[in-house]
């Protein structure tokens, strides 16, 4: 793919990435025109989509009152952070990528790296804050309702930015090597070994471990609650089939006087009658009978089931109830499996996207400073790894907002409003 790659030469520059640079990569500042055009179109499209997607999420939360809750405040803050990445960081990163050299000066380079590390770290830590909020909500739903306040969300958001500052500021205060500023055509983050470990573990590896633990526990808790619901429903059905008591046997007439219409116990209401907790036969002078059966279920209301019966034999054998219970239990099992599969799919998308976008970059970012002289990073591969990390700011609003029906409805309202204005 020669047209997509810079023309190779003898000079070496650093492969630019979300944290400034990954390390040494072979290439020169003179690049092919086709590479510049195609790269500009691709990166311009990515930046435009990232800005538009995150701006729509912020607008939806600001305009739609039903979306203004603590959980969505975290998603909105994530969208603001990714919007900052898209507006403040990606344009300079794209210019660096297209020209294959840094042309904006050392002061702008320091500012670019600081903003890059700050915003990308805060974006990653927002994902941890969302995972932590969901973990508390599903494992302690009763108490957390009162604890889930805007102040708590503000504290989590402030913590993500504080950690981002603590990771981005040290290189500006001198935690770097002399070689970091030796090449005026390169804009590199500190290659100091201590800072490399500090920044990569603080910005990615520790948050990754935390997210894996939290979402693992969320999955176990969700699966336990789903299966507990199914078992509870099955237990109710079993209790209803076995919990049968004989009906009372009143001998008085309805109005308390002899000769009136009697209520007598029907034989089908005895203990042998399945699902019947009480049964009585109303017998008139003409010999016609009507049995009224009350079916009691734990935690539900009574069901009055009038059944026409013959005068001599009135069985209580509602086999259709048993079949209905079995069908209901089977339907609930299928629904539980579907919910469990959906939970696995959702958590898989969240963690899979995060790992796919960031793990390759942070592996290279951790390894390259320790083997700078012997390791080689091809220019094209370095660019793909770098922009894979940046693309997480485009995918976050899709995962956390656009799959949500409430957000979808808000987006439709925004679009319809625009159409109305055009008319």
Swiss-Prot record:
Short name of one Pfam family: 7tm_1
Gene3D superfamilies, sorted: Rhodopsin 7-helix transmembrane proteins
InterPro entries per UniProt: 5HT1A_rcpt, 5HT_rcpt, GPCR_Rhodpsn, GPCR_Rhodpsn_7TM
Example of a GO MF term: serotonin binding
Short sequence motif named DRY motif, residue ranges: 133-135
Chain positions recorded as 1D-myo-inositol 4-phosphate binding sites: 345-346, 352, 403-405
Compartments (UniProt record): Cell membrane; Cell projection, Dendrite
Extracellular topological segments: 1-38, 99-107, 175-193, 371-378
Motif annotated as NPxxY motif, chain positions: 396-400
Any GO BP annotation: adenylate cyclase-inhibiting serotonin receptor signaling pathway
Spans annotated as Disordered: 235-277
Oligomeric and partner information: Heterodimer; heterodimerizes with GPER1. Interacts with YIF1B. Interacts with GPR39 and GALR1.
Protein's recorded name: 5-hydroxytryptamine receptor 1A
Gene that this polypeptide is encoded by: HTR1A
């Amino acid at each position: 793919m020669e047209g997509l790659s810079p023309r190779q030469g003898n000079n070496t520059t650093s492969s630019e990435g979300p944290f400034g640079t990954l390390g040494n990569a072979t290439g020169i500042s003179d690049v092919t025109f086709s590479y510049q055009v195609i790269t500009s179109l691709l990166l311009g499209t990515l930046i435009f989509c990232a800005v538009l997607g995150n701006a729509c999420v912020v607008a939806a939360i600001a305009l739609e009152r039903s979306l203004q809750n603590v959980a969505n405040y975290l998603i909105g803050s994530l969208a603001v952070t990714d919007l900052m990445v898209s507006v403040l960081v990606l344009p300079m990163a794209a210019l660096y990528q297209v020209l294959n050299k840094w042309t904006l000066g050392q002061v702008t380079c320091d500012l670019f790296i600081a903003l890059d590390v700050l915003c990308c770290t805060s974006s990653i830590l927002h994902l941890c804050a969302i995972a932590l909020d969901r973990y508390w909500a599903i494992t302690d739903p009763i108490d957390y309702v009162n604890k889930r306040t805007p102040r708590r969300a503000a504290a989590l958001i402030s913590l993500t930015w504080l950690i981002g500052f603590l990771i981005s500021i040290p290189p500006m205060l001198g935690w770097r090597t002399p070689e970091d500023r030796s090449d005026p055509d390169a804009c590199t983050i500190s290659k100091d070994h201590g800072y490399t470990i500090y920044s990569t573990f603080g910005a990615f590896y520790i948050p990754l471990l935390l997210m894996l633990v939290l979402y693992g526990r969320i999955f176990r808790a969700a699966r336990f609650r789903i299966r507990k619901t199914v078992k509870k429903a099955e237990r109710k059905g079993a209790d209803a089939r076995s919990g049968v008591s004989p009906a009372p046997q009143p001998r008085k007439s309805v109005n308390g006087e002899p000769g009136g219409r009697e209520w007598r116990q029907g034989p089908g209401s005895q203990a042998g009658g399945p699902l019947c907790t009480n049964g009585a036969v109303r017998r008139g002078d003409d010999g016609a009978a009507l049995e009224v059966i009350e079916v009691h279920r734990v935690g539900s209301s009574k069901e009055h089931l009038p059944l026409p019966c013959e005068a001599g034999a009135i069985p209580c054998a509602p086999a259709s109830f048993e079949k209905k219970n079995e069908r209901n239990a089977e339907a609930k099992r299928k629904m539980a499996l579907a919910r469990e599969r959906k939970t696995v799919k959702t958590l898989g998308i969240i963690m899979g996207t995060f790992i796919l976008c960031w793990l390759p970059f942070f592996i290279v970012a951790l390894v390259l400073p320790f083997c700078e002289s012997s390791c080689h990073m091809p220019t094209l591969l370095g660019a793909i790894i770098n922009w894979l990390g940046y693309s997480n700011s485009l995918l976050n609003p899709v995962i956390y907002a656009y799959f949500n029906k409430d957000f979808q409805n808000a987006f439709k309202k925004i679009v319809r409003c625009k159409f109305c204005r055009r008319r």
